[in-house]
Amino acid sequence: MMSVSLRMATVDDIESLFEIRTSVAQNHLSRKQMDELGITPQVLRSAINEGPCIWLAEVDRQPVAFSMIDRAEGEVFAMFVRPEHEKCGLGRLLMDAAEAELFKTHERIVLVTDGRPEIRANGFYQRLGWTVVERIDARDVRYEKRRPLL
């Protein structure tokens, strides 16, 4: 029986976050590509130090998935699961945590991702109640989700 836990990431987890991010097959980015996009260890360190914004899922104490929010923008900025840990409920757990935090201060939250049909994450987000509201470019789409009524 595997033991699953969810916790806030600390600066000590930065290397693990990059390892998880570069492990994915779909929407893959190398360290060099992330660097070119401004996604660097320094940027993650600043984000973590500004306030809790990254949830880390661990299986048997090993970091295997994470979600990250941009609180000011009301955006789920990232959600990645190591391929060998997909379809175990970790993505849903991480999205629930990110959404709950964003819904504290936003009525409507967003995420941007590769919207091509072959990208499996689209079906995942749609099953969680996210709706495509805009095509941003040839690849990316913007999803939106509204705070549930009580």
Regions found by a protein language model. Name each.
Residues 1-12, 148-150:
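Conserved N-terminal entry element of GNAT/NAT acetyltransferase domains
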Residues 11-14, 18-84, 95-97, 101, ...:
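Acetyl-CoA-dependent GNAT
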Residues 76-79, 109-113:
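Conserved hydrophobic beta-strand within the GNAT/NAT acetyltransferase core sheet
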Residues 82-88, 117:
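Active-site acidic-Proline motif in GNAT/NAT acetyltransferases
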Residues 87-100, 123-127:
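Conserved acetyl-CoA-binding loop-helix of GNAT-fold acetyltransferases
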Residues 110-122, 138-140:
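Conserved beta-strand-loop-alpha-helix junction that forms the acyl-donor binding cleft
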Residues 125-135:
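Conserved acetyl-CoA-binding loop of GNAT-fold acetyltransferases
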Residues 138-150:
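Terminal substrate-recognition subdomain of acyl/acetyltransferases
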